């Protein structure tokens, strides 16, 4: 086994991306998506159906609120935010199977995946810079 094979295989065991998380949700795979950002970020918008648990609260809340047999996917703001990694560490310490969603909320939104806030669903946006935007052809 090469160093590269070992490295990338290990990396993929611990991370996922917005497209794969959305596909897992649509397929009904049993995952819990956890937003580890703060209250203001959560109020602004989040992944539809996500649970809010800021990373600093995971140690005290997870056991009471989450089934430890269900895999967890954590996310924060963007590729430049490390709160997702901090949250993943906290879940791992507690024995949860956890993966970090790379790209965070930013890439979820840019890929046009469903989001919501306390008012309800938010408009879906599609950014052609990060994904293929397919237009429906009439006929």
PLM regions: where:
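Conserved beta-strand positions in the Rossmann-like core of class I SAM-dependent methyltransferases
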Residues: 32, 51, 99
